[in-house]
């Protein structure tokens, strides 16, 4: 954590900025800088008394090197703060310095290729970004008249997603699943596939994830040659709940600058949005708020909206977001999962049953949805093939119980054909990932939408099957020799 002198220098640098929005923030800050004393310490919550110039909600204050954000005003002179760094060494009566402004983070091309924390400070061992502009992490979402809706899809190269749950450019897509079904591997593959073909800027925001995953991702993106057009931000699971709660807003502030000021399209990948909700619940508990359903904070819907509503497209550019969402105990009626669902244009549901069968990615073809899967957007052929695939897999699900009780031989010829098609479709929708090459031993494959449609169409047209269904497992595009019989 940087010392107090460095913070003062950063504030002075902000005052010299040519950015009008930042100059206005600094002008307001000069009216609110004050000194206070620590009044009470309760875990990560610190009460501070100010005699004058009481800081505002979201303002950043410092007690030595300890950073805190003002979360509540208790009375005329007392504020309640959430610690953003360890409180070790903090004592009653210690002086507290108010900066007069929220957290300000560097934005612009200077942050590309860097790994940063919630304060915009480097955690990659390199010098601080040489940025001339900084912005507050607390920004209002664009007004309705500035928003635009795109009717184009973002091709991922992953068959199951592109076919059944296409991602909207400028939309929000959720990867839902319980523990151990492959959310992080899938989002890492999406980074590998989309960042290399994405013409704009990519941001990865790790909320409450393992430090090991951050290091691996940083190295892999360097090896893939996409790090120079990517910003990585982390609020790791070992950090204070306030950090995990705010790091998503830091990522959005940087993404908004690329979109609004530089006119670029942004790909924002978040792993994991549930950790944002979890951190909000911890902060709410520290502040003494009464919990709501299943122990979540009463402000769950408001806090999610404050994050999700900033992810949108404007006339200047688009922010396309792909978010991993942990589902506690595989319960999709959990309030956190239910609230996140309502903000998304596409939902990719990962099934534990499919994962247990070795069908990776474990995308549930019947539960995954997208508003983009309409003839007007993807075309009539894509729409018809996707519907036929879903119908075939749904019929197979209905036949599973009969097969388990009586055996496959007791089915009619038509039903046996449905089962053969469905099992081949299930295996064809599996795919070797570039991000999993090191532990799977399979060479990764990126498959175009056209190749995916052609492969599914050929399987759906088959009436007799001379090949083995295992031949369709963990391949990319369907080889030419696999023709209908």
From Swiss-Prot:
Task: Report how it sits in the membrane.
Answer: Peripheral membrane protein
Q: Output compositional bias ranges, type Basic and acidic residues.
A: 1-10
Question: Could you tell me which PROSITE patterns the record lists for this protein?
Answer: ATPASE_ALPHA_BETA
Q: Where is the composition biased (Polar residues)?
A: 11-24
For this protein, the record's InterPro entries field holds: AAA+_ATPase, ATP-synt_VA_C, ATP_synth_F1_bsu, ATPase_a/bsu_AS, ATPase_alpha/beta_chains, ATPase_F1/V1/A1_a/bsu_N, ATPase_F1/V1/A1_a/bsu_N_sf, ATPase_F1/V1/A1_a/bsu_nucl-bd
Q: Name one GO cellular component term.
A: plasma membrane
Recite the UniProt keywords alphabetically.
ATP synthesis, ATP-binding, Cell inner membrane, Cell membrane, CF(1), Hydrogen ion transport, Ion transport, Membrane, Nucleotide-binding, Translocase, Transport
Q: Which GO terms describe its molecular function?
A: ATP binding; ATP hydrolysis activity; proton-transporting ATP synthase activity, rotational mechanism
EC number(s) from the headed UniProt entry = 7.1.2.2
Specify the enzyme's EC class, one word.
Answer: translocase
Chain intervals for the UniProt region annotation (Disordered): 1-27
Write down the chemical reaction(s) this protein catalyses: ATP + H2O + 4 H(+)(in) = ADP + phosphate + 5 H(+)(out)
Complexes and interactors: F-type ATPases have 2 components, CF(1) - the catalytic core - and CF(0) - the membrane proton channel. CF(1) has five subunits: alpha(3), beta(3), gamma(1), delta(1), epsilon(1). CF(0) has three main subunits: a(1), b(2) and c(9-12). The alpha and beta chains form an alternating ring which encloses part of the gamma chain. CF(1) is attached to CF(0) by a central stalk formed by the gamma and epsilon chains, while a peripheral stalk is formed by the delta and b chains.
What protein family is recorded?
A: Belongs to the ATPase alpha/beta chains family.
What is the name of the protein in this document?
Answer: ATP synthase subunit beta 2
Tell me the name of the encoding gene.
atpD2
């Amino acid at each position: 954590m940087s010392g107090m002198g460095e913070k003062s220098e950063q504030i002075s640098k902000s005052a010299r900025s040519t950015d009008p929005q930042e100059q206005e923030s600094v002008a307001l800050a000069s009216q609110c800088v004050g000194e206070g004393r620590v009044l009470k310490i309760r875990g990560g919550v610190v009460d501070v008394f100010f005699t004058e110039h009481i800081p505002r909600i979201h303002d950043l204050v410092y007690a030595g090197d300890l950073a805190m954000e003002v979360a509540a005003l208790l009375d005329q002179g007392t504020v309640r703060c959430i610690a953003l760094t360890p409180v070790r060494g903090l004592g009653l009566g210690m002086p507290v310095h108010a900066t007069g402004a929220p957290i300000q983070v560097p934005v612009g091309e200077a942050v590309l290729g860097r790994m940063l924390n919630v304060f915009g400070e480097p955690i990659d061992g390199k010098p601080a970004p040489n940025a001339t502009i900084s912005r507050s992490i607390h920004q209002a979402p664009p007004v309705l008249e500035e928003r635009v809706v795109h009717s184009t899809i973002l091709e991922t190269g992953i068959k199951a997603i592109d076919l059944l749950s296409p991602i909207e450019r400028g939309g929000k897509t959720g990867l839902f699943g319980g523990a151990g079904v492959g959310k992080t591997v899938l989002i890492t593959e999406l980074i590998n596939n989309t960042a290399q073909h994405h013409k704009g800027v990519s941001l990865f925001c790790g909320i409450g994830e393992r430090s090991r995953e951050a290091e691996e991702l940083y190295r892999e993106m360097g090896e893939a040659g996409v790090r120079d057009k990517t910003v990585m931000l982390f609020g790791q699971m070992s950090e204070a709940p306030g950090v995990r709660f705010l790091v998503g807003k830091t990522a959005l502030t940087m993404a908004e600058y690329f979109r609004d000021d530089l006119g670029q399209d942004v790909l924002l990948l978040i792993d994991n949005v549930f950790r944002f909700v979890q951190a909000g619940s911890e902060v709410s508990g520290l502040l003494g708020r009464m919990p709501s359903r299943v122990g979540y904070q009463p402000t769950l819907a408001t806090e999610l909206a404050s994050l999700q509503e900033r992810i949108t497209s404007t006339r200047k550019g688009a922010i396309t977001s792909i978010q991993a969402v942990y589902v506690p105990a595989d319960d999709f009626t959990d309030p956190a999962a239910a609230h996140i669902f309502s903000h998304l244009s596409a939902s990719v549901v990962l099934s534990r049953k499919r994962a247990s069968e070795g069908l990776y990615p474990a995308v549930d073809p019947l539960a995954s949805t997208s508003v983009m899967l309409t003839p007007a957007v993807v075309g009539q052929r894509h729409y018809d093939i996707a519907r036929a695939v879903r119908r075939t897999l749904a019929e197979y699900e209905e036949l599973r119980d009969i097969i388990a009780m009586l055996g496959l031989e007791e089915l009619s010829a038509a039903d046996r054909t449905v089962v053969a098609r469905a099992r081949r479709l299930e295996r064809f929708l599996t795919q070797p990932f570039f991000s999993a090459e090191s532990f799977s031993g399979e060479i990764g494959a990126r498959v175009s939408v056209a190749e995916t449609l052609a492969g599914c169409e050929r399987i759906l047209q088959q009436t007799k099957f001379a090949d083995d269904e295992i031949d369709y497992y963990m391949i990319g595009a369907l080889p030419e020799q696999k023709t209908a019989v």
